[in-house]
Amino acid sequence: MSSYKYYDLIRKPIITEKTTTLSEQNKYAFYVDKFAKKLTLKKAIEEIFKVKVKKVNILNVKGKKKRFKGIIGTQINRKKAIVTLEKDHNIDFAGGIK
């Protein structure tokens, strides 16, 4: 699979208080494409970030029901991937920020 398709699999990293505490354990969270599989995500993370992936956990997040101007709607369903890296590897999301 070419590298540009790997960039389509990973939507965006999840940067919250909970995921920053997970990064201390070498675990990083991403929103990914809803058709992504564990093996292709592992290859994509390894090629894009040049790290060694130990394990990938995937979970589907159901969209919440929200109200807007009296009309009830739902947010989109998402797929979340929690990636565990090998011991000496890490991903720096804020590398160029000073």
Curated annotation (Swiss-Prot):
- Tell me the SUPFAM superfamilies matching this sequence: Ribosomal proteins S24e, L23 and L15e
Q: Which domain of life is it from?
A: Bacteria
Q: What are the protein's UniProt keywords?
A: Ribonucleoprotein, Ribosomal protein, RNA-binding, rRNA-binding
Question: Which GO terms are recorded in the biological process aspect for this UniProt protein?
Answer: translation
Q: Which Pfam family, giving just one, matches this sequence? A: Ribosomal_L23
A GO CC annotation recorded here is: ribonucleoprotein complex
Enumerate the InterPro entries for this protein: Nucleotide-bd_a/b_plait_sf (IPR012677), Ribosomal_uL23-like (IPR013025), Ribosomal_uL23/eL15/eS24_sf (IPR012678)
Give one GO term, molecular function aspect: structural constituent of ribosome
The entry's function note states: One of the early assembly proteins it binds 23S rRNA. One of the proteins that surrounds the polypeptide exit tunnel on the outside of the ribosome. Forms the main docking site for trigger factor binding to the ribosome.
Subunit record text:
Part of the 50S ribosomal subunit. Contacts protein L29, and trigger factor when it is bound to the ribosome.
Q: Which PANTHER family match?
A: 60S RIBOSOMAL PROTEIN L23A
Give the similarity note: Belongs to the universal ribosomal protein uL23 family.
Q: Which protein, by its recorded name, is this?
A: Large ribosomal subunit protein uL23
According to the entry, what is the taxonomic lineage of the organism? Bacteria, Pseudomonadati, Pseudomonadota, Alphaproteobacteria, Rickettsiales
